[in-house]
From Swiss-Prot:
Binds to 23S rRNA. This is Large ribosomal subunit protein uL23c. Belongs to the universal ribosomal protein uL23 family. The keyword Transcription does not apply. It comes from Prototheca wickerhamii. GO terms for biological process: translation.
């Protein structure tokens, strides 16, 4: 099932906390997912309309050279009256 590819919400960083005020939510996801797949997954799971998706791969830690990041971080923008986490 594709739901296993959506790992967890990111709310522990200061930037992610600021983004919540703008109706943007951060998630760590499987690094192989594309933007259309992410949009379909989020819209079906949360039953909402996604306005925009931004993705990036966080830099890996210096201590662990030789290994690629295991996840991709995605920022999902939704309508003003929707709350995904509450």
């Amino acid at each position: 099932m594709m739901l296993n590819l959506l790992q967890y919400p990111v709310i522990k960083t200061p930037k992610a906390t600021r983004l919540l005020e703008n109706n943007q939510y951060s998630f760590d996801i499987d690094k192989k997912l594309t933007k259309p797949q992410i949009k379909k997954l989020v819209e079906e799971y949360f039953n909402i309309k996604v306005l925009a998706i931004n993705t990036h791969r966080p830099p890996r830690k210096i201590k662990r050279s030789g290994s690629a990041p295991r996840s991709k971080r995605v920022i999902i923008t939704v309508s003003a009256n929707i709350n995904l986490l509450g």
